[in-house]
A protein has these predicted regions:
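C-terminal substrate-binding/catalytic lobe of Rossmann-fold NAD(P)-dependent dehydrogenases
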Residues: 1-131
Length: 131
């Protein structure tokens, strides 16, 4: 998967997970996060029909009510996260003007490398699709 869970930003009750999970357990959490959606739909014996509708509802509410919520969105990047001319899922502030700002979260060197790898995988698929 091209998902890059940011374990360096993960906390529990305000405490960084790195303070109570060793590297092996952190890697386990990362891998489980990547497949969590598929695991849940398999356990429920259904498809992901609710989540997309709920996500659209949150987006519309943030625009209509100018809530300026930070919401993960697939957006065309122009230098953010070191990427340009590619749509990737990143956090953005959504308000009455739509995308008000792409939130450029500081990444560790390892996370930057994984993000670049994911971006290159998307570029490869886009190339296969002739985008």
């Amino acid at each position: 998967t091209g998902m890059v869970p940011l374990i360096s930003k993960a906390t529990r009750n305000g405490v960084p997970v790195s303070e109570f999970l060793n590297e092996e357990k952190q890697n386990f959490v990362i891998e489980e996060t990547k497949i969590g959606g598929a695991t849940l739909t398999k356990l429920l014996g259904t498809s992901a029909w609710y989540a997309p509708g709920a996500a659209v509802s949150v987006l519309v509410q943030s625009v209509v009510c100018d809530q300026k919520k930070m919401i993960p969105c697939s957006l065309m990047l122009d230098g953010e996260y070191g990427q340009s001319d590619i749509c990737l899922g990143v956090p953005a502030i959504i308000g009455k003007n739509g995308v008000e700002k792409i939130v450029d979260i500081p990444l560790t060197e390892a996370e930057k490398e994984k993000f670049t790898t994911a971006a290159n995988a998307v570029r490869e698929v886009n190339g296969d699709l002739k985008f």
